[in-house]
Amino acid sequence: MNLFTHLFLISCGASLGAMSRHGLTLLLNPLFTFLSFGTLIANYIGCLIMGIMLAMFWHSSAFSTEYRLFFVTGFLGSLTTFSAFSAEVIENLLQHKWLEGITITSLHILGCLFFTTLGVFIWRYFQ
């Protein structure tokens, strides 16, 4: 595959990931504005899927480079956006909302580590 095919696959995956994240933000942020809930859930879902995919890649080398570029680099890279998370934390800290900033940071980091690990275990369970 050539560079343009790879860029096309990444772009297609990224478009779907960005639309998914935006949809989650519109749907969930109004429920818990304190937590930027849509971004949190997007990161949790993305990390869960990433854990499953990591376990799949470790288990089998049958997954093509193109598959990884579309799903991991494109879709998940766009769905789980660290820039949105960091912006939300910094906004809270600059407004002296220390508890909110620390809570968002803790939930994202610990939750994402948990869901990535859970994804690995889910894949192993079904093997």
UniProtKB/Swiss-Prot annotation:
It is a multi-pass membrane protein. It is found in: Cell inner membrane. It catalyses: fluoride(in) = fluoride(out). GO terms for biological process: cellular detoxification of fluoride. The chain crosses the membrane at residues 7-27, 37-57, 70-90, 102-122. Its main location: membrane. Na(+) binds at G77, T80. PANTHER family: FLUORIDE EXPORT PROTEIN 1-RELATED. This is Fluoride-specific ion channel FluC. GO terms for molecular function: fluoride channel activity; metal ion binding. GO terms for cellular component: plasma membrane. Belongs to the fluoride channel Fluc/FEX (TC 1.A.43) family. Keywords: Cell inner membrane, Cell membrane, Ion channel, Ion transport, Membrane, Metal-binding, Sodium, Transmembrane, Transmembrane helix, Transport. Na(+) is not transported, but it plays an essential structural role and its presence is essential for fluoride channel function. Fluoride-specific ion channel. Important for reducing fluoride concentration in the cell, thus reducing its toxicity. The gene is fluC.
